[in-house]
Structure formats: C-alpha cells, structure tokens
Amino acid sequence: MSHPSLLNFVQEMSRMLQGKPAEPDILMRGASLLANLVANDNWLPEEFTRPHPQHYQQYLLYADPLDLFSMVSFVWGPGQKTPVHDHMTWGLIGMLRGKEVDTHYHKQKDGSYRRGEGVTLLPGQVGSVSPATHDVHEVANFYQDRSSISIHVYGGNIGRINRHVFDPATGQPTSFVSGYCNSVVPNLWKM
C-alpha cells in the first residue's frame, strides 16, 4: 500500500524540478518538501523497511522517467555504515526513524581525505550533499542495537550513476554503481 504523502511528495518535487531551478534552490526547497514528508512516520510501506543482517538496504521508492530525481529508502541494520563515497549529483537525506550519523570528508592537497565532524540526523531532520560543496561522506546508523531508516532524494537515478568509494588515507577512488535491492516499487496511486 502507498500513502498520499508519498504521492504528494513526488508530485511537488516533480513540479519544482520541471522549472529547472538552480541547485541551491533545489536543496532549499527540496529540503522543505522532504522535511514535511519525514515529519510523519506512517506512509512508508512495510516491505521497504526491512533491514539485512550484513549490509544496509537501498530500496527504490521512485525514479523519475526523465532522471530528474530518484527517491530511496535506506534501511540501516544495527551498527551498519557506508564506506567513504561520493554521489556525483545533489542529494537530500531525511531521517524517518532512528538516528544516522553523516560524516563529511575533506580532500587534502596530497589527495587523501580528512574526516570532518559527524552530524547526527534525528527523525524529521534533513541533510544534504552536493558536488559543488560537500559530496564525499560516510553514513552510519547511530544505533548498535536497532535499525534506522532514512529517505534519500537524488538529482538523477542514483542506482544507475557511476560513483566512487574512496580510501581516505590515499584518496584512491574505486568506481561503483549501487543499484537497488528491491524488484518492485510502491504503487503511488493506490491508496
């Protein structure tokens, strides 16, 4: 089952992006839309909330047919985290359940990456990434004993974008395409 909030978010995000706003406007206006969505924890279908015992899950919720944006439910099992990685596009992270620690990395003159301070996202809060300002980070579930869920929105189909993980000590990149763990997406029009 889907919930009207998900459909409303997709419609509003689509309307905004069709106007071709500048990235700072996308991040500001998109963050407001996403904050409204994650303010309520009653719309995400249960099948997109299931953790995996070994690694985080990336469930596709929506992918715009023109690649204007995609929307993903990230489900973090206890203690799970990403490697240091980039996105190659803008992104918004809305915390739905639990807590997540977002740690940005800063490229140094020698090519290595220096770890910055982590920011903890609480339910209802929204963070962002952008190649223009802060694209390289590591994300971790704050909790060691329970799952957390965040809703991510990206400027393109993130599951098809060629991105990179980095060795922070050397800066050495390794290319990857994340894909998705689900084979079906929510029916936005079925209430």
State what each model feature region is.
Residues 169-191:
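Long hydrophobic alpha-helical segments typical of transmembrane helices together
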Residues 72-86, 132-134:
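Conserved short histidine dyad/triad with adjacent acidic residue
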Residues 50-78, 126:
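A short glycine-rich, His/Asp/Glu-containing loop-to-beta-strand
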Residues 1-42:
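N-terminal leader/capping segments at the start of a protein or of a new domain
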Residues 107-136, 179:
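Short acidic-glycine-tyrosine-enriched beta hairpin
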Residues 87-103:
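Glycine- and acidic-residue-biased ligand/ion/polar-headgroup-sensing regions
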Residues 92-94, 145-160:
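A short hydrophobic beta-strand segment most commonly corresponding to one strand
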Residues 131-151:
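Ligand-binding loop in jelly-roll beta-barrel domains
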